[in-house]
Amino acid sequence: MSEQGSYDIQQVLKALPHRYPLLLVDRVKSMDLGERIHAVKGVTMNEEFFQGHFPGAPIMPGVLQVEAMAQAAAILGIETLELAGTGKLVFFMGIENAKFRKPVTPGCLLDLEVEFTQKRSRVYKFRGKASVEGVTTSEAEFTAMIADPPA
């Protein structure tokens, strides 16, 4: 498949329906359509979840790292299938083998690397890894489907 250059936040917003406070992809660094994506999330102290996770020792929840990987996967799926702007949504169906390795704290640049592992009709499987400065912070496999938004 073809290699795509980086996507700024405006292109991310066109591909994803997510908005603040749950938009967890800031930029796409590279994408090989139909294969893989490398996106990033700048983690700042301004994130709402740091108010309660944990006061005095802020750590990004692992489930939000998985959500960030899923959003990167959604961009990959939407762009691969040329569905940006059609209103189609990517819905999470399952998470498997999630592992949380290292904490992510304010000031980190979270790298999100996701690849397709299986493609069938409207159901897709992905493998993702989140890392900071080359150190894996979390990883997971997940299943998603592409569908019309709920009526």
Curated annotation (Swiss-Prot):
SUPFAM superfamilies: Thioesterase/thiol ester dehydrase-isomerase
GO cellular component: cytoplasm; membrane
EC primary class: lyase
GO aspect biological process, one term: lipid A biosynthetic process
MF-aspect GO terms: (3R)-hydroxyacyl-[acyl-carrier-protein] dehydratase activity
Primary location recorded for the protein, binned into one broad class: cytoplasm
Keyword Calcium: no
Compartmental location: Cytoplasm
Keywords for the protein's UniProt record, in alphabetical order: Cytoplasm, Lipid A biosynthesis, Lipid biosynthesis, Lipid metabolism, Lyase
CDD domains: FabZ (cd01288)
Active site feature: H53
EC number of the protein: 4.2.1.59
Top-rank lineage group of the source organism: Bacteria
Keyword Ligase belongs to the record: no
Function, in words: Involved in unsaturated fatty acids biosynthesis. Catalyzes the dehydration of short chain beta-hydroxyacyl-ACPs and long chain saturated and unsaturated beta-hydroxyacyl-ACPs.
Protein name: 3-hydroxyacyl-[acyl-carrier-protein] dehydratase FabZ
Annotated source species: Erythrobacter litoralis (strain HTCC2594)
The organism's taxonomic lineage, starting at the top: Bacteria, Pseudomonadati, Pseudomonadota, Alphaproteobacteria, Sphingomonadales
